[in-house]
Amino acid sequence: MSGDNVRKMVTCTKTSGEFEKGYPDTIIIHYTAGPYQSSLNTLVNPKVKASAHVLIDRDGSITQLVPFNEIAWHAGESSYGGRSGYNKYSIGIEIVNSGPLTKSGNVYRSWFGAAYNPSDVVEAIHRNQSTAKYWHVYTAEQIETVRQLCLELMEAYPNIKQILGHEEVAPTRKTDPGPAFPLDTLREQLLGSDRKSDGAAQLPETGRVAAKTLNIRNSPESDGQLVAQPLPKGTMVSIVSEQNGWYKVRTTVEGWVFGKYLDIN
């Protein structure tokens, strides 16, 4: 890979050789659960049985570790869609992000002790969980780099038809990339969506709940039936469609919310 977003190439020997013919056909998105340098050290450490194809820093820059035509060790024990062992099917993208955070006074802390301000945090419900937690936000630069990289990979490897989270191929043990990453929106953009045609007005991609709580309903009207518990303030949602000031959104559930109470990204 080449271009302005590539910081450097780092040699990583932790591969299982080249993909078989017809693969890769999947991209898997991860968070590092740690800062850039320690994550890079882990990924290249020969004593650690983990690697990835690329590592994306907070500024959107890319470090490539494993060639895209070779199998990296990022998915681990994994299964999805009737297949298991996703390393042999997929390209692994690691994004520098601390994952779940714990509130401590006026700041939020990662498992390794880093402190974050409220502006770096979103409260949201994970797709595999039922209660809201605090999560480290991704930067706009990271999200755009991931989008552009996925486009390039899909062009280079036309068999790629899936973009998955680690949380989807290993739901009982992994939570990355988590609800702070707009995974569903990315899939809609790159793999086809139910949005309007190109000639229609551009919908915003994501939003955050601005009210203390926000009802999510089965129809775009104030007397629509509630489909889940109200979304707490800060919840990030993927926007699917719009109708008369209401947005159809997706988190762990799908439903309609009144657009007035969303901060649009």
Locate predicted features.
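Active-site-adjacent loop/helix surface patches within enzyme catalytic domains
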Residues: 2-159
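SH3/SH3-like beta-barrel fold
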Residues: 234, 247-251
